[in-house]
């Protein structure tokens, strides 16, 4: 069994609630296995909230809007470069380490390569985030990720309208025991 959060939008801070759903984990790396997990989480959520319309936000989503809103596909405009880049790249390139290193070249690789870049693991302690000349503290933990994600949605009017059709957000790959930020939380906000 596994547990994953569903983020539900609300009108007061922190602007979301979390419902943890326990489900039978379908192991494996195949997309079909990941989609079985998505379905299991959503089915469990609908048992609690029968009127719910949840959306998986990931490249494995069963709904195209969820794929478009994934950090690998949702684009964020970077004023200095006069170009848009995937959220994943902006997030990884925004990390600033204790020696002052910031790997802005991660904007120019695939989102998968940006996420897996070895330098991110070997550069010491993360001290802050930096984007467009603005520094972001590490606490609250998801501040920077939420900032770039929400602004990217605002920049995309079509997706900003589509996201309103849903009232619960998941990111099945996100494990709160191992990670801090999730696109599901950002979408709920």
Feature locations, PLM:
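Active-site nucleophilic cysteine motif
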Residues: 176-189
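Generic hydrophobic-segment detector
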Residues: 17-18, 123, 176
């Amino acid at each position: 069994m596994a547990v994953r959060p569903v983020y539900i939008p609300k009108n007061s801070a922190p602007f979301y609630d979390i419902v943890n759903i326990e489900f039978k984990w379908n192991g494996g790396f195949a997309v079909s296995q990941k989609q079985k997990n998505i379905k299991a989480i959503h089915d469990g959520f609908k048992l609690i909230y029968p009127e719910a319309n949840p959306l998986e936000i990931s490249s494995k989503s069963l709904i195209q809007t969820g794929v478009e809103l994934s950090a690998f596909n949702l684009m964020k405009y970077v004023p200095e470069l006069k170009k848009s880049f995937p959220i994943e790249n902006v997030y990884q390139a925004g990390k600033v380490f204790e020696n002052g290193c910031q790997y802005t070249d991660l904007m120019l690789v695939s989102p998968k390569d940006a996420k897996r870049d070895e330098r991110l693991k070997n550069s010491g302690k993360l001290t802050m985030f930096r984007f467009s000349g603005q520094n972001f503290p590490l606490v609250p933990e998801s501040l920077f990720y939420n900032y770039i994600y929400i602004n990217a949605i605002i920049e995309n009017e079509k997706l900003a309208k589509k996201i309103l059709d849903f009232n619960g957000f998941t990111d099945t790959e996100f494990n709160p025991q191992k990670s801090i930020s999730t696109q599901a939380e950002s979408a709920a906000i």
